[in-house]
Amino acid sequence: MESIFNNSFATLVAYVGIVSIYLLVIPLILFYWMNNRWNVMGKFERLIVYGLVFLFFPGLILFSPFLNLRLRGDSKG
């Protein structure tokens, strides 16, 4: 019985780890990367970013109300 509990707990920890990486860690890294490189990306890098946005869309949706990628305009009045 004890091995079943340990096995279930290990499975639960693995699932929580994978879900947190998929929904939290990689989308935040992707937001940071897009925010810093948006205006200087080449076409292949942009293609990779579009693929990653498609792949990690659920995590990006979680952070979209709090982060935005608006372009910085001139600070002239």
UniProtKB/Swiss-Prot annotation:
It is found in: Cellular thylakoid membrane. Keywords: Membrane, NAD, NADP, Plastoquinone, Quinone, Thylakoid, Translocase, Transmembrane, Transmembrane helix, Transport. Its main location: membrane. GO terms for molecular function: oxidoreductase activity, acting on NAD(P)H, quinone or similar compound as acceptor; quinone binding. It comes from Prochlorococcus marinus subsp. pastoris (strain CCMP1986 / NIES-2087 / MED4). NDH-1 shuttles electrons from an unknown electron donor, via FMN and iron-sulfur (Fe-S) centers, to quinones in the respiratory and/or the photosynthetic chain. The immediate electron acceptor for the enzyme in this species is believed to be plastoquinone. Couples the redox reaction to proton translocation, and thus conserves the redox energy in a proton gradient. Cyanobacterial NDH-1 also plays a role in inorganic carbon-concentration. It is an enzyme of class 7 (translocase). GO terms for cellular component: plasma membrane-derived thylakoid membrane. This is NAD(P)H-quinone oxidoreductase subunit L. PANTHER family: NAD(P)H-QUINONE OXIDOREDUCTASE SUBUNIT L, CHLOROPLASTIC. The chain crosses the membrane at residues 12-32, 47-67. It catalyses: a plastoquinone + NADH + (n+1) H(+)(in) = a plastoquinol + NAD(+) + n H(+)(out); a plastoquinone + NADPH + (n+1) H(+)(in) = a plastoquinol + NADP(+) + n H(+)(out). It is a multi-pass membrane protein. The keyword NADP applies.
